[in-house]
């Protein structure tokens, strides 16, 4: 299983890719798509092109993205929503299902507390994946999203397995 995590942003969109083998997590790649274009349509296309390049290069089998949280500034929420929508659409065009997680769920899965600081997320991502240095914030967030997805999908698989066992016992 190869998981692509996306941390959408209107200026910087982070991506992180992990591979799972024998229930162990391995770092594959991470980085930032830095938006340099001007004009909304060109900026959104740059996000789509960057994600398409990542998908074509690393061939993820699953993807996950951070949900939008409430902003005080409606303009910022709109821009983030546009970036997130383009990211999700690009993943769907590339035949990837997209799972969504809140910032609190991601922090809980990686750090153990939903109120963790960004520096704590960076530190735990570095530790979990055995990296020699902390990844940049946006890349660390994207890797954390991928890690969260792995833990969530593993839990759901256990629940589904337990449900099948319970149904067999009932019959």
Curated annotation (Swiss-Prot):
PANTHER family: CROSSOVER JUNCTION ENDODEOXYRIBONUCLEASE RUVC. The active site is at residues 7, 66, 138. Its main location: cytoplasm. Its EC number is 3.1.21.10. This is Crossover junction endodeoxyribonuclease RuvC. GO terms for cellular component: cytoplasm; Holliday junction resolvase complex. Keywords: Cytoplasm, DNA damage, DNA recombination, DNA repair, DNA-binding, Endonuclease, Hydrolase, Magnesium, Metal-binding, Nuclease. Homodimer which binds Holliday junction (HJ) DNA. The HJ becomes 2-fold symmetrical on binding to RuvC with unstacked arms; it has a different conformation from HJ DNA in complex with RuvA. In the full resolvosome a probable DNA-RuvA(4)-RuvB(12)-RuvC(2) complex forms which resolves the HJ. The keyword Nuclease applies. Mg(2+) 1 binds at residues 7, 138. The RuvA-RuvB-RuvC complex processes Holliday junction (HJ) DNA during genetic recombination and DNA repair. Endonuclease that resolves HJ intermediates. Cleaves cruciform DNA by making single-stranded nicks across the HJ at symmetrical positions within the homologous arms, yielding a 5'-phosphate and a 3'-hydroxyl group; requires a central core of homology in the junction. The consensus cleavage sequence is 5'-(A/T)TT(C/G)-3'. Cleavage occurs on the 3'-side of the TT dinucleotide at the point of strand exchange. The lineage of its organism: Bacteria, Pseudomonadati, Pseudomonadota, Gammaproteobacteria, Thiotrichales. One of its GO terms (molecular function) is crossover junction DNA endonuclease activity. One of its GO terms (biological process) is DNA recombination. InterPro entries: RNaseH-like_sf, RNaseH_sf, X-over_junc_endoDNase_Mg_BS, X-over_junc_endoDNase_RuvC. Belongs to the RuvC family. Its cofactor is Mg(2+). Mg(2+) 2 binds at residue 66. It catalyses: Endonucleolytic cleavage at a junction such as a reciprocal single-stranded crossover between two homologous DNA duplexes (Holliday junction). It is found in: Cytoplasm. It comes from the Bacteria. Binds 2 Mg(2+) ion per subunit.
